[in-house]
Amino acid sequence: YEIGVRLVGSEMCIRDRVKIDNAAPFKISFNSPSDSIVTLATALNDTVHTVTIMNAIEAFHRQPEFKGFLLDKGKNLVSPPNLPQRKIEFIGNSITCGYGIESVEASDPFTEETENHYYTYAAITARNLHAQHFAIARSGIGIYRNYNGPREGSPDCMPAMYYQTLFNDSSEIWDFSRYIPDVVCINLGTNDTSTPGYDTDSLYNAYLAFHKTVRNNYPKAKIVWLTGCMLHGESLSLVKNTLDRLSDTLHKAGDLEVYRFDMTPQTGELGYGASWHPSLCLLYTSPSPR
């Protein structure tokens, strides 16, 4: 989630990424079983400030709740700035989450401390295009087979979970009319093909079925299918060829708002994040468009 607010005052209290006015963003952490008050800033000039809060980690094991702001006595929120008109939805896996992006060692394990969605290709792209962005992502998830999953597929792959508001709660179904993107970017397939045992026909059929789901939700959106920067060799060729086939099939069927984009495979030249994931430095370079 991302929350933006404007307020009058000098002090405010609320693991999130915080940006105040034009200052560099910073991360705050809190871990409490009960409601917590976290101070975001003190000693600000007593004037209007713009504050943005972004959930920096994936909410697979946690259910973040924002209860509100505490302001100086007698101070209040003011009318917020208009949101950007452009809207993008990103659907993906750990690369989209920002898994290990602040780590400096490929051998590091996953920790919430080094995950940061703010520095992912998704968030950076949205900021550069002055767009709102909505991310639906979970580490290890696939289009039909999660990381090292069975050949026949995983019951909790992205198409099965896509309808849920929260990954860990199947009771609340998301209302897709609440956010209608102009562009949907889908980066799935890395986990499906990262280990042996995948089925190529199941991979293609899952891509096709999920595309129809997304198209049904957003009839006018441009849908962009991506290959991620962690794919290499046989897996990269397979996913590229499968997505090219998907795009061709959909174009011939009359869906002309389908596009392809391949990220440049990472080489280690710019370092790695945890578990060989992209580093913050790598994600500031430009992928190669097709």
Feature map (PLM): residue ranges:
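Structural recognition of the beta-strand scaffold that forms the well-ordered cores
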Residues: E89-F90, H133-I136, D182-N187, I223-L226, ...
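Conserved small/polar residues in nucleotide/adenosyl-binding loops
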Residues: Y1-I3, L7-D16, Y284-P289
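Exposed aromatic-hydrophobic patches
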Residues: S36-T42
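Extracellular serine-dependent O-acyl
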Residues: K222-C229, S235-G273, S286, R290
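Short glycine-rich His-centered loop
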Residues: Q85-E113
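Exposed low-complexity, polar/acidic, P/S/T/G-rich flexible segments that act as propeptides
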Residues: A56-K87
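Short strand-turn-strand beta-turns centered on an Asx-Gly dipeptide
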Residues: K19-A23
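Conserved SGNH/GDSL esterase-like catalytic core that processes O-acyl groups on lipids
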Residues: P33-S34, N45, H49, A56-P64, ...
